[in-house]
């Protein structure tokens, strides 16, 4: 497994979705090249035989998951990008007159509908994992193994 392989495969899968853009492709590169240092943003370091999926808060790693499975790495990135794109749609259509977003059941359902539509185009195993509601925070429970998540 290498970072370039993961980026190319993720990009190919996302190109199946009409909402994907060149800006999102740049974000994939940031996830893998270590320049994505904002709070609560996904980062991936691909080493020789495994990848480290992690999230930072104020420069400190607050969550880390290690895996040897390329499809888990790709799923983490797909989930992150699809979430960002769906948030854009939500902000464009579900804010009040003052510009505030209120997370109501309608907003949550709309976000889920967008994600479900996108993952249905990505195929398996990604679509199934999305149907199961697996997020990066659930990787240890869902994918098990000796790859323990770390919370700081």
Residue map of PLM features:
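Intrinsically disordered, low-complexity, charge-dense segments enriched in Lys/Arg
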Residues: 86-152
């Amino acid at each position: 497994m290498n970072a370039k392989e993961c980026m190319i495969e993720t990009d190919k899968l996302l190109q199946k979705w009409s909402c994907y853009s060149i800006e999102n492709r740049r974000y994939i590169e940031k996830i893998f090249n270590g320049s994505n240092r904002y709070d609560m943003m996904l980062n991936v370091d691909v080493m020789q035989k495994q990848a480290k999926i992690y999230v930072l808060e104020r420069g400190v790693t607050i969550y880390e998951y290690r895996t040897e499975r390329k499809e888990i790495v790709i799923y983490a990135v797909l989930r992150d990008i699809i979430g960002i794109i769906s948030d854009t749609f939500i902000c464009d259509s579900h804010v009040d007159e003052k510009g505030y977003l209120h997370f109501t059941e309608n907003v949550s359902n709309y976000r889920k509908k967008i994600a479900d539509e996108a993952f249905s185009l990505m195929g398996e195993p990604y679509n199934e994992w999305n149907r199961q509601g697996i997020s990066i925070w659930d990787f240890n429970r869902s994918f098990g193994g000796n790859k323990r998540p770390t919370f700081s």
